[in-house]
Amino acid sequence: MTTFKAILLGIVQGLTEFLPVSSSGHLAVTQHLLGVPEDRILFLTILLHVGTLFSVFFVYADDIFMICKEFILMIVDLLTGKGIRVNNQYRKLGLLIIVATIPTGIIGLFFKDLFTSFYNSTLIIGISLLVTGTLLWTAEKVNTGKRDIKDMNWFDAVIVGLFQGLAITPGISRSGSTIVGSLFRGFNKELATKFSFLISIPAILGATVFEVKDVLEVGLGDFTLTMLIAGVLASFLSGVFAIRTLINFIKKEKLYYFSYYTWTVGSIVILFSLL
């Protein structure tokens, strides 16, 4: 393992975590090309996820601060006998993030082993990439939603959470699936994008907790402090770039551009799986 490889893995993690192209598949391919066994870099992988989390905190700092503030105030209201008062958009958004996380967590807990087994099938990965591309294309072409946060309800959050849960399938993009799920529910593009990135926080945190258990079993690995810092910084910076790039693409109604990429990669993967 070298610092250069750590930086390259960080860049791939940051870009593909938030661009709708499936991060798991790209990271696995990159590890293979670099000749780095997955079990030897689990600790680095966890830190790269932390770097991408910082990306979301950086881009949506104001929203996250207000959500946390209002959530604390809502708990204070509850403890002082005022009940749960959802009297502003940040309180509502915070509760809906929790609701969306529930189906995601259930799928992750009970079906993780099943979906993980799909990593052994390049055919399934290729087909999943084609599905991702088709969803992105369809959502961009047929959606005319204008629903805002005031129009959201718990059922919307559950549906988007289910989309996020199914994204543990290798080849299915988490950001792509949640944005598509939001657009299918009629959200406006700004809300669909924001909600997708905000619900990624508990999802990434949860996945990271599961990975910590694996790290304790295989060890931290042979890394220098320079390697770790370089990798995390690379994942953070590339993550910020990816989030802002995706926001720009969605504003310009060019989300379907990513369809061409996932269709191409998916077709290549399927072709190789059949050879």
UniProtKB/Swiss-Prot annotation:
EC number(s) stated in the UniProt entry for this protein: 3.6.1.27
Where would you find the membrane-spanning parts of this chain? 1-21, 41-61, 95-115, 118-138, 192-212, 223-243, 255-275
Q: Which GO terms describe its cellular component?
A: plasma membrane
Its membrane topology: Multi-pass membrane protein
Q: Which Gene Ontology terms cover its molecular function?
A: undecaprenyl-diphosphatase activity
What's one GO BP annotation on this UniProt entry?
response to antibiotic
Which chemical reaction does it catalyze? di-trans,octa-cis-undecaprenyl diphosphate + H2O = di-trans,octa-cis-undecaprenyl phosphate + phosphate + H(+)
Which PANTHER family does this UniProt record tie to the protein?
UNDECAPRENYL-DIPHOSPHATASE
Q: What does this protein do?
A: Catalyzes the dephosphorylation of undecaprenyl diphosphate (UPP). Confers resistance to bacitracin.
Q: What is this protein called?
A: Undecaprenyl-diphosphatase
